Amino acid sequence: FRSEFMFMGRDGHLPDEEEQYQAYRRAVEGMQGMPVTIRTVDVGADKPLDRTPMRAGEDHLNPALGLRAIRWSLSEPSMFLAQLRAILRAAAHGPVNLLIPMLAHASEIRQTLSLINRARDQLTNAGVPQGGGDSVGRAVRSTNTAISCRVTGAEAQ
């Protein structure tokens, strides 16, 4: 499930947690017990959002290397937490795997896992049913990241 398409073409209004939850839940229930892999927002040069103006430093020669995918999500923690809560809530309805795009560095892995745990805690404290998220994976798209998997793999497990 490529979640970024829910965030695009919305005239500056991002989907809230409830809207995302309903979409993910429908996908999970529609798969009737088969696992669903939900990729967190992967926006950037090739899939820009109409909501955010270009930030300082994003006008370099290769915009694909700028603030995108997990880097964008980590820079927008309230949006990312809402997405994570929606995914965890949908996982109460069937098996869900979480795919994090362009997760490359150990620090990004630690930040992401910390936010996943925070989202779990928020749902638990609110008494909201959630699934475990059967696995968390990362999309590897660069040679450097592929080579570093041996090092960062200990962080990701």
Which role fits each region the language model picked out?
Residues 1-157:
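Conserved alpha/beta-domain cores
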